Amino acid sequence: MNIGEASKVSGVSSKMIRYYEQIGLISPAVRTASSYRTYGDNDVHTLRFIRRARDLGFSVEQIKELLALWRDRSRASSDVKAVALEHIAELERKIAAIQDMTRTLKHLASHCHGDGRPDCPIIEEMAKGGGAAKTEINPRFGVASLK
C-alpha cells in the first residue's frame, strides 16, 4: 500500500510516517520503480503501536525502547513494566507541576482587582522573569509566586 493508504489504516499522518522513518522508528519503506514508498501489514502494525504509545505520552526515545522490547520475543515483562513505571512517574511530576502552576495563577488572579487600576500581581509576577517556575511566598501579596 502507498503512504496515503498506510496513513489511513494506521491513523498516522503521512508526514509523521516520513518522520518516523527518518528517525528510525520504522524501517525505510520499500520503494517502487518510480520511488514511491510502499508499506505492508507489518509496517501498519508498527505504526499503530507507535500511535498508541504517543497517545499515552511516551517520548520518541521511550518508543524506541518499547519497540525494541516488542520485537524481542525473549524480553522480560519486567523490562516493559520498568519503562511504563518510569513514564508514570514522569507524568505524575508533570501533573504536580501543572497543579502547582494552577494554584499559583488562581491565587494571583484572586488578588488582581481586575478593574481600571494599572497594578496587577499577575503582570508583576511575569515581569520578574526568571527560569523555571518554582513556588515561593511573595510577602507583598501574601501569595505563592513563581520564581
Swiss-Prot record:
Claim: Cell inner membrane is one of the keywords in the record: no
Record localization: Cytoplasm
Keywords assigned: Activator, Copper, Cytoplasm, DNA-binding, Plasmid, Repressor, Transcription, Transcription regulation
UniProt GO BP: positive regulation of DNA-templated transcription
A Pfam family reported for this protein in Swiss-Prot or TrEMBL: MerR-DNA-bind
A Gene Ontology cellular-component term: cytoplasm
SUBUNIT field: Homodimer.
Purpose of the protein: Regulates the transcription of actP. It detects cytoplasmic copper stress and activates transcription in response to increasing copper concentrations. In the absence of copper, it negatively regulates the transcription of actP.
Name by which UniProt lists this protein: HTH-type transcriptional regulator HmrR
Organism: Sinorhizobium medicae (strain WSM419)
Lineage: Bacteria, Pseudomonadati, Pseudomonadota, Alphaproteobacteria, Hyphomicrobiales
